[in-house]
């Protein structure tokens, strides 16, 4: 694939976690190709012994004899790990195969509770023959014994894998001479492994260059004696072609491409399983030197692995018989193409045949996720071979919320190179499940105790860590092939959160994370000269409230070597194990013992021929031994071990050979030389007893104490075992090795340890709570401990209210009940909790000698008093936390005092002259303002007044929330509230809330400014023309009483008009008021609000509103009533006149009650009486009479008042009726009266009319007046008045005396009498007229009688 950044040819191969991987690492050793075996360590997998599959290499063409190069592989220890808190995974994969030049292996072994999943190691056998050598050693691959799971009482075999090598003697020079004539060559079997790694490998940083490979692939030599004249035809030497050409059409291949399920679990996983490519290639004799053929593979295939340098393993093809190169290789990784160019070898030999056997791999780059029917194909020449596989990646390691995956993605190892030991890269997926993690941390550690030869390292000097954040929903490549351009580089954000620690570790603090991250660790190998080192790197993701998820990756390196000495050789080996049941036979569950030295001697010559040290799993192998008898000796056994019995049973591969035994190698490996060892075990213990006399020695009558816990620890303090004493006080620890131990006795409840080692008999005295026991080849039953029952005591005293705060209990101060008191031991552990009783007393009982901590909980609303203020500890306060000591008696001195703290609340009331709501420097306080304090339930607690500076304060207040209310001082108005940002300077208004919390609150203030005052008044005048308007010639009326009422109807001022009729009320606030004019005696209210002019009369009662300005528009007018009356009786009218008026009066009376009716009015017309009288006018009303007087008496006058009508009559009624009323006139008017009705009923009568009346009648007069008479029950009349208006005719409706002024002081007009909505007014008006008329007639009659 192309480098996504530099567009150069690279191959990125990802190693998938939890799977097997095959690797090869090229080292700088001439003639040596390094082989890598990889493992993936997964925490939390179930126990499963490593298994191995066996396979043998077969020749590709039976007609051709071939042998593999010598290869050697050391397996990485891959035992399963059992890790607490991690999940189990029983799907462990293991695979060991050996085919031709390739060996793939893996296995699982236990490493301290961790589970290991092996990654398959790809073995590519490459040997380099020097040009001057005439022969290459012959080698074959043999199946290796491998460690397998034992069932049906079968024993475990050690985990071994080794190649058996056969080396041919070198042929003579004669046999290697070149022949001039072209000869027929033997069939050649070519085997080459291209190694795949799951790493990102940069081929060339600048271009997609073709990599020429200089690691040769050696054609295996025939195992049969070489005969040049057999199956070889020497061709005449012909000139080589001058032009290179593609001869794919001249290449015939018979190819198979097989998907190999390495661990036979029916799941195909890239970098774990692989493809086996086998092909027999025949070269047409037409091919010339310089011609070439190609091998093309699909994008889903990769032919080299973790190490970019391993591309060189695709090497030249050589004839192993003479080392001559047949074709040179050129590998174009960018285009998945291998080009082989023929040398002149094909010019000199006919019938050239080649056989290849490649292990090639699946490219995780092009298979990012699990997928079915993935195609893989390889084209050799023009023949394409295909196969498909269902790819199934394993899941990540998940433990609760934590999830993780990791893989080595590139390794380059340079053994023995101090300056450049090589490097490796590990790719880690953090939280691929995208859970929300709290306090997430990743630990990367190149260390594991089971891999002491680990060449990995993590430290700040050599390690570079890159961190990428994965977008939400992004699918990560399950083969760990990461395209970082699609991720966000957040490395700089975490540079300060990377901590390097001991044991080659680094911790990255991700904090709270809810997305996935990719961490790439690029670091150097440690320098090593070992040809078989291991690389192990562990990763652990932890977060709060979730179990950690851990796994690891491991790689093993081994060397393959070509060559040997010309005879067949074999191996001796087997196993050293711990025979726990001492029966001398290997059994299931018994483990191998490492670091035991095994030495092999030639039994005939006593010459040392080999030596090895057992691996961690106890296995060993000594190779290159020809047939013969050998003595195998074991030495350097672990300290404390002894040898188990030898030759127990009938299976020599399972029994123990002892420290020294003789075995025979005869045509095959002998893997039966093993050794069983065991650790002898001993007991340690004794007795725990009750030392009733406290002398520290076991007496005969003193008995054991059962149920006492005894703990056994090693020299480092690690707990080994815990037991409890039996019914007799005895205890025993069994199965112990020689060594020093620590024994700890737990003091039984209610007991105290007795004195230690009081006597000289170590088996009888007490060893105390902690002692040391030594086992040295024998049991140790001398460690005992004595205890006696502990006496009990009391501790306590008193909690009181220290009212005077002096820290001492006074006789008048009382206890506080219900206070919580807690008793703790010296370690701060709570022992007891109690509360004080009603008197403040408390007590803790049943206490042993010792030091105790007593803590008093401060009761609500109280504060602790001062501590230790007196010399008498029995009465002073010990504070809220103190220490009390009990030493063989009660301690009743631990007490504590509290008092209720009080605080102040208040501030300031000021005159806010500029009305801005904020206290300014030049604004002064207002004294005498009442301030009220209430509790949260609105209950009044206190009331104060501000001092001369405007300050106020409420004292002795407890913590709490309070309400403060300010009373507005007379003549002031509250200013604006909270106008500024300074709570101590702005106004809190009339009502505010104050909180006291352990401190005074002096921030509650209120501002007021002086209220503006206004005036109200105007004029009362004599309305001589009765038109309801002030005329320039009309003068004021003196001494008219004017009363001012507030909105509540309360009298707030009374005055009289001055000599000019003027009146005035001052110092009034804005608001609603009522002005009442008292009608002067003998005067009649003039018409009201007759115009829109401020000069008209407002009536006897006026509502007015003052809003920020004076109001001098409230006036009223009166006129004098006509008396005349004359009556002159007789109506005579003659002149009539007179009378006229007469009537007038009418009204007069009225007054009375005013009432009404206002309207009266009208009279209008008056007079006119001219009888026309008609006055009709409807309304008439008014009683017209209108005095108008005069005139016309003509009696007619009738004044008829027509008016009448009204009927309404109203009221009055009662009255009179006199009816008489007759109103004479009958007269006329026609209709007049009509009215009738109304009441008066009468009427009729009348008429008499005589009427005449006239006169009299008139009587005018007087009566009028007022009514005096009024009697008439006043009533009515009401209106009477009305008349007013004489006026006659005009009959503008009369306005009532009481009017309402709007905000502009304009009188609101009443409806006209002709309005349909004012029927009641008309009724009242006419009723008033009739009442007035009745009253007049009645009065006239009376006068006549008086006369």
Curated annotation (Swiss-Prot):
Motif interval(s): YSIRK-G/S signaling motif: 23-34
> Residues annotated as region Disordered?
55-185, 857-883, 972-992, 1078-1323
Q: Where is the major localization of this protein?
A: secreted
* Matches recorded under SUPFAM superfamilies: Bacterial adhesins, Hypothetical protein PA1324
Q: Where is the composition biased (Basic and acidic residues)?
A: 130-145, 174-183
Q: Where is this motif: LPXTG sorting signal?
A: 1310-1314
User: What residue spans carry the Acidic residues bias annotation?
Assistant: 1091-1101, 1118-1286
Which parts of this protein are propeptide?
Answer: 1314-1347
Keyword Secreted listed? The answer is: yes
The membrane topology of this protein is: Peptidoglycan-anchor
Which residues are in the CNA-B domain?
569-680, 681-791, 792-901, 902-1012, 1013-1123
Region ranges (Ligand binding A region): 36-568
Where does it localize?
Answer: Secreted, Cell wall
Polar residues bias located where? 62-71, 94-109, 146-155, 163-173, 860-869, 972-981
List, alphabetically, the Pfam families matched: Big_8, Gram_pos_anchor, SdrD_B, SdrG_C_C, YSIRK_signal
Q: Which GO CC terms are listed, alphabetically?
A: extracellular region
The protein's matches in Gene3D superfamilies, at most eight in alphabetical order, are given as: 2.60.40.1280, 2.60.40.1290, Immunoglobulins
Presence of keyword Calcium? yes
Please give the superkingdom of this protein's source: Bacteria
> Where does the record locate the signal sequence feature?
1-35
Q: Name one GO biological process term.
A: cell adhesion
This protein's assembly is summarised as: Interacts with host DSG1; this interaction increases S.aureus adherence to keratinocytes.
PANTHER family this protein is in?
CARBOXYPEPTIDASE REGULATORY REGION-CONTAINING, COLOSSIN-A
Q: What does this protein do?
A: Cell surface-associated calcium-binding protein which plays an important role in adhesion and pathogenesis. Mediates interactions with components of the extracellular matrix such as host DSG1 to promote bacterial adhesion to host cells. Contributes to the resistance to killing by innate immune components such as neutrophils present in blood and thus attenuates bacterial clearance.
The entry sums up its family as follows:
Belongs to the serine-aspartate repeat-containing protein (SDr) family.
Protein name, UniProt field: Serine-aspartate repeat-containing protein D
Query: Which gene name belongs to this protein?
Result: sdrD
